[in-house]
Swiss-Prot record:
Function: Guanine-nucleotide exchange factor (GEF) that acts as an activator of Rop (Rho of plants) GTPases by promoting the exchange of GDP for GTP.
Pfam families given in the database record: PRONE
Protein name: Rop guanine nucleotide exchange factor 6
Entry domain remark: The PRONE (plant-specific Rop nucleotide exchanger) domain is responsible for the GEF activity.
Record carries keyword Acyltransferase: no
Residues in PRONE domain copies: 98-479
Low complexity bias (residue ranges): 31-61
Gene Ontology terms for molecular function: guanyl-nucleotide exchange factor activity
Keywords assigned: Guanine-nucleotide releasing factor
Organism: Arabidopsis thaliana
Domain of life: Eukaryota
Region (Disordered) residue spans: 31-89
Length: 579
């Protein structure tokens, strides 16, 4: 074995260090060292010839890997292997900073399971009856938030394990957007001077603009929670407060969320510096909330209205609204603010039902106005000219009225959403999310929605601490139990629609309660109060007007309009009456 190794080494010097010969040399040297170690360990006391061979091997030792390959290598990989394979003890982190193999395997298996659910569309049977990829990604983002960040009942830093899991998992889900591109024309110059127009790929404009902004908002919210590591306030479970209080049964009423923790402040209240910091953090969170709501409203507005939603609409606006709302919207003295003041909006169901009715009436009126105009154009040209003018004038007047009514309903819906920013998604929004096929828009909508929920929760928690500080300073020497009872009482009044302080206007959000048939993913249902909230949203974008970020309704699409084909004098008259 010794001679073979020396011959091999000299041969490698003679014929050059090619890759194949180097690999063969390394294998032969490794085998020779292994065989020599095994033979020396099996024999007891070696002979003189054995000692001389060992001495010769020590003099002419084989070259190291670093000498052969030309770069430094670790010493651990060149050591002689013993006869018995030593089982490595699993360590959490080795000397090189790598995690143990078991942890990597579990993470890989988790990613495999998540990608399998996305590809199968949440249909584990594999029969192809799952949801579309857009809805599957939206469901995955929503469920990930609910599992990791959905229970923010305290102002405290997020555990490092949850933080790493959130960032790793959300990056995996958002990585799909890296492959969503759009083709743009560009010119390519050749050496001979010719210029040819080619199509280049670039990231889609909405993802390129909004997704980095959402990532930045995500990091800001996590940094806000990390800033509450050392605070002057603390939290106490309501069960402990009830056991210590002599009036333990005074607040145990139906609907009281006794399982939620209550904030506590010192008897003399928070310091001025802490108070200013909380006020600044509240305003900063408010701006983040507005940005998330704006991106979410734009993403929803750009989604197409499902045909199933349009087919389920009633035939006229009175059937959608009811007699009371219909009379107020169609009256000459219409005022959205006065109408909202005259309606009982003390319950969440009443507000959601009103929003659904008003939103449906918008589409009914606009669809009827457009359909009447097309019917008048599709009639035969053999009709007398006078009848054509009369019908066109009559339908033009009816269409203008319906368009005015639709604009009034839209303004009423905007005022309603501004008054209740935590309003749950309407039937149209839910239908858009369910039937949306655009993966990019689905990512923007779901990511902005969960960040909006997180910002809202942080704002509510800050308001709770500030409210407890106000109570402690007003009461002076009042005990903590009375402060806790007041906070519970005002929280219950806020949930039932009471009015008063800022804490009443922001009730704890209940994020996920609506689900679709065929999928297990819930959707946002933020709670609200009937009073005007402190978080006023950005101006909402109408899904009908077009404008910036808006889309045309399906019944206004160009493929359904035949007037482009030309109707002679009838088309000229229609264009004149429009202008």
């Amino acid at each position: 074995m010794e001679d073979n190794s020396c011959i091999g080494f000299e041969g490698s010097k003679r014929f050059g260090e090619t890759s194949k010969r180097i690999i063969g040399l390394i294998d032969s040297v490794t085998e020779s060292t292994t065989d020599s170690s095994l033979s020396s360990s099996s024999s007891g006391v070696g002979s003189s010839s054995g000692r001389s061979s060992v001495a010769e091997r020590s003099v002419s030792s084989p070259p190291t890997k670093s000498q052969i390959l030309g770069w430094p290598l670790g010493q651990g990989s060149w050591r002689k292997s013993s006869g018995k394979m030593k089982k490595k003890t699993p360590t959490k982190i080795d000397d090189f900073g790598f995690k143990r193999v078991g942890t990597e395997t579990s993470e890989i298996e988790l990613l495999k399971e998540r990608m399998a659910k996305l590809l199968l569309g949440e249909d584990m049977s594999g029969s192809g009856e799952g949801v579309c990829p857009a809805l599957a990604i939206s469901n995955a983002i929503t469920n990930l938030y609910a599992a990791i960040l959905g229970q923010q009942w305290r102002l405290e830093p997020i555990p490092s394990e949850k933080k790493l899991m959130w960032r790793r998992e959300i990056e995996v889900l958002l990585s799909v957007s890296d492959h969503i591109v759009e083709l743009v024309p560009s010119f390519q110059n050749f050496p001979n001077g010719n210029k040819i127009e080619v199509m280049n790929c670039r990231p889609r404009s909405d993802l390129f603009t909004c997704l980095p902004a959402l990532r930045k908002l995500d990091n800001m919210l996590i940094e806000i929670l990390d800033s509450f590591g050392e605070t002057e306030f603390w939290y106490v479970d309501q069960g402990i407060v009830a056991a210590e209080s002599a009036r333990s049964n005074s607040f145990r009423e139906d609907g009281d969320k006794w399982w939620l923790p209550l904030p506590r402040v010192p008897s003399d209240g928070l310091t001025e510096q802490t108070r200013k910091k909380l006020d600044h953090t509240r305003e900063f969170t408010n701006q983040i909330l507005k940005a998330c709501m704006s991106i979410n409203s734009i993403a929803l507005a750009e989604m197409e209205v499902p045909q199933s939603y349009l087919e389920a609409l009633p035939k006229n606006g009175r059937s959608c609204l009811g007699d009371f709302l219909y009379r107020n919207i169609t009256s000459d003295n219409f005022s959205a603010d006065h109408l909202l003041e005259s309606i009982d909006l003390s319950s969440e169901l009443a507000v959601v039902e009103m929003a659904n009715r008003v939103e449906a009436s918008m589409y009914v009126w606009r669809r009827r106005a457009h359909s009447r105009h097309l019917i008048s154009l599709y009639r035969s040209t053999s009709t007398r000219w006078g009848m054509i003018v009369k019908e066109m004038m009559m339908h033009q007047t009816d269409g203008d009225k319906r368009e005015i009514f639709a604009e009034r309903a839209e303004s009423l819906l905007i005022r309603l959403k501004q008054r209740f920013p935590g309003l749950r998604q309407t039937a149209l929004d839910t239908s858009k999310i369910q039937y949306n096929k655009d993966v990019g828009k689905s990512i923007l909508e779901s990511y902005s929605r969960v960040l909006e929920s997180l910002a809202y929760s942080i704002g509510v928690r800050i308001e709770e601490v500030l409210f407890m500080d106000d109570i402690s300073k007003d009461d002076g020497d009042g005990d903590d139990d009375s402060c806790s009872d007041k906070l519970r009482l005002l929280s219950k009044e806020a949930a039932s629609g009471g009015s008063g302080s800022l804490r009443e206007k922001l009730s704890a959000p209940s994020l996920f309660s609506v689900s679709f048939s065929g999928t297990s993913t819930p959707y946002r249902t933020l709670s609200f109060s009937a009073s005007t909230p402190s978080y006023s949203p950005m101006p909402l974008i109408s899904p009908i007007n077009g404008g910036r970020g808006g889309e045309r309704a399906p019944f206004l699409s160009g493929r359904n309009i035949r007037e482009r084909c030309g109707f002679g004098p009838k088309k000229a008259l229609a264009n004149y009456l429009r202008g």
